[in-house]
Amino acid sequence: MQPLELYIHIPFCVKKCAYCDFLSGPAGEKEKEEYVKMLVDEIRNCPDTVQNYRVISIFFGGGTPSLLTGEQIGRLMDTVREIFTLDEDAEITMEMNPGTVTEEKLRKYRQAGVNRLSIGLQSVNDEELRLLGRIHTYEEFREAYHLARANGFSNINVDLISAIPGQTVESWRRTLEQVMALSPEHISAYSLILEEGTTFYKKYVEDEAKEGPKLPDEDAERQMYWDTETLMEKNGYHRYEISNYAKEGYACRHNLGYWERIPYLGFGIGAASLVPGDLIGKCRKLEGKMSRYTNPDQLSEYAHSYRNKFQAELLTETEEMEEFMFLGLRKMNGISKKEFSEYFGKSLEDIYGEPICKLESLKLLEQDDDRVWLTKRGIDVSNSVFVEFLLEE
């Protein structure tokens, strides 16, 4: 049976954070329950061909999935088991906001099968948390973290954000050091991105932030980036992707599957799917082997459309090749030349020989007989590197 991943989107949050451009917002208990019922219906509407696949990971993302009750998460997991073949050791992750954690929820999430938590901390500095619009303090995060440990969670990720307004190199180091002292199995460390439509974008891009804390300058941001890798490696966290670090054996399997282009089904509003033609019951065209579908981002449209989920758009071979490179090169071990040729029936050198030679001469890429990967310098300018792998249609 071929591997498959599931993503379940929970679009609810207590309030929108200043940097967040994800599909999320506040909702009442009645709305949450109605949404869970729609998710159950959508999962049950999957075609029989999903039985040809085994689910290796499930990710509850948001929003704030931990706003759902243990019973609601249990119902969703029961439905997944009813429709899909779930690996015994499947990785089942739930994103969690420290301000929404209770012991009862944690206990019931564990009973439902959740075996990995991703806790959104972002900073240990309460003033930085306030600026971000977070609903919790650092102490509340610590309480939630220890409560999760006490309830049997032995695989925990902590999300962090650098380059926050008013943040200094020293305060970022304190965040890293204090989080590593807690010894989570995994740490995701992202640099703040000002996304259009967010509170931060309006303040720092459109209004140019005439008052209040300023964004760190480029030198400070770069130092934070370098300090992250240095301190993580020193404390036993291996960098396996541009923004992700893990102790040995604790790399996020769901994320690795995404970067390695394992098929995935997304459930809920705005959720994306990437599926092979045989899963959706359609004959594959000559160009492209995978299809993409994104659910509507409006609840009213989603409620009436998910039954037609599998009317998907076939990716062209060009799009697939570009994704193969963009996603694979995010991993520290890069991409496999053999896997490229086996999947596309063409050698990597024939398609990308010129940009690879150019980037190698600039010391942005390295390669051996089978693999191509980013150098440390290439990681620093990864977006510029990825542009080189765009193909003309």
Please give the residue ranges for each predicted region.
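Immediate flanking context of iron-sulfur cluster ligation sites
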Residues: 2-10
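C-terminal scaffold of the Radical SAM
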Residues: 3, 24-46, 53-346
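Local cysteine-cluster metal-coordination motifs and their immediate loop/turn environment
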Residues: 11-22
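Short amphipathic alpha-helical interaction segments
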Residues: 346-358
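A short, conserved structural fragment
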Residues: 360-370
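Minor-groove-contacting beta-hairpin "wing" of winged helix-turn-helix DNA-binding domains
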Residues: 371-375
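Short, amphipathic alpha-helical interaction segments positioned at domain boundaries
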Residues: 377-393
